[in-house]
Amino acid sequence: MSLADIIKDIDKSREEQISKINDEYSKRIEELKKSCDSRIQSIKEYYEKKKEADIKTLKKVQEDKIKIDSKSIKMEKRREIVKDALDISYYHLMNITKSKRYDSILNSMVSTAIKTLGEDCEIFASESDAKKINNAKADHKINGGIIAYSKDKKRMLDFRLNSIFENIKDDLASYFYENIEE
């Protein structure tokens, strides 16, 4: 064998080994690519599902927040309506002193006080109302209605209009809340 043949033989052997190594590593590279592509696809699917679940959860949270905010706004509006209704009721009750029925109401208060506390009870009323009631004493703190004390001062009836309103205010508020349409 000549030197040229030996070199050819070595070159051929080298080329065959290079080709064999290339084939072997090409297969490995292809397998790695497929494995990586599969993992990438799996990860993409996982995160796509996770994203959809997160979006669904976020949407649910936002819907719940909107419902809560809506209820809160409705409740606040109802509170405003009830407050306005109570203010109007208070205004009308306090202005009953200007009505034609007020003298009759005042007489009824006095009669109840006398029946409950006795003939000798002390009655206090506003200056203008005291003039309408026999033996009543004027009290500038009273804007309408009366306060009556038993002779021994152990019992009292408070028929002042603002006290009456305070006593019925919670019931009125409940009534208004129940009758407000949603």
Swiss-Prot record:
Disulphides: none
Family annotation (InterPro entries): ATPase_E_C, ATPase_V1_Esu
Principal cellular location given in the protein's record: membrane
SUPFAM superfamilies: V-type ATPase subunit E-like
Localization, UniProt: Cell membrane
Keyword list, A-Z: ATP synthesis, Cell membrane, Hydrogen ion transport, Ion transport, Membrane, Transport
Keyword Ribosomal protein among record annotations: no
GO cellular component, one term: plasma membrane
Annotated membrane topology: Peripheral membrane protein
One Gene Ontology molecular-function label: proton-transporting ATPase activity, rotational mechanism
GO BP term, example: proton motive force-driven plasma membrane ATP synthesis
Similarity comment text for this entry: Belongs to the V-ATPase E subunit family.
Family matches, as NCBIfam families: PRK01194.1
Subunit details: Has multiple subunits with at least A(3), B(3), C, D, E, F, H, I and proteolipid K(x).
Function according to Swiss-Prot or TrEMBL: Component of the A-type ATP synthase that produces ATP from ADP in the presence of a proton gradient across the membrane.
Protein name: A-type ATP synthase subunit E
Organism listed in the record: Picrophilus torridus (strain ATCC 700027 / DSM 9790 / JCM 10055 / NBRC 100828 / KAW 2/3)
Gene that specifies this protein: atpE
